[in-house]
């Protein structure tokens, strides 16, 4: 096994709330400077910048993970991670059919830029990505897993779109992993919700600016002699709740 410092929740300039400097190449470069080994790109309800992100990360020696931050019909944010680009693209096609056809207003919400790995703009998503998709939390998780991925509630320690803030509880009969935005909140949430003690905990940044990307603090111990194998190991740990790191 090898140790990989990670950040599994990063937004690019495709997310309207993401800074325009959050290009795939800039994210990969900053993650490399910080010493991260695995980084997931998780834009709101879209994975269209993941191909450019893969190319940029591979140049920097980082293992990229294709992902999405899905907004469910309950208005809960769900991190969805995939073993490869094709799985993420298929999942996105399913989600795109469930997104409301509301046009983005860049002057209000921000631009939604689709990039190549050289920081070139190749397009712009016209429909607003922030709105909830017509898919429930449970169905979103199941759909993600049907494409070989893993899904878990994002930033449960935040008021905005966190599962606890929205639903009033962390469902006790589920086998979700869960994400914290602040590692120092772990004890508080374990005390409030004892049933999460045996679930896989993930600490990630939800970065919308380059300086928000995680420092090399949280890590997984993962198997694999290739990027594909390491991604499969990561998803297996998340799905099965293994205590993979800290």
Predicted features and spans:
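Conserved acidic
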Residues: 39
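Charged catalytic cores and adjacent phosphate/nucleic-acid-binding surfaces used
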Residues: 1-8, 12-30, 34-36, 47-90, ...
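Active-site gating loops and adjacent loop-to-helix segments of metal-dependent hydrolytic enzymes
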Residues: 83-125, 168
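Alpha-helix-centered segments that form part of catalytic cores
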Residues: 111-147
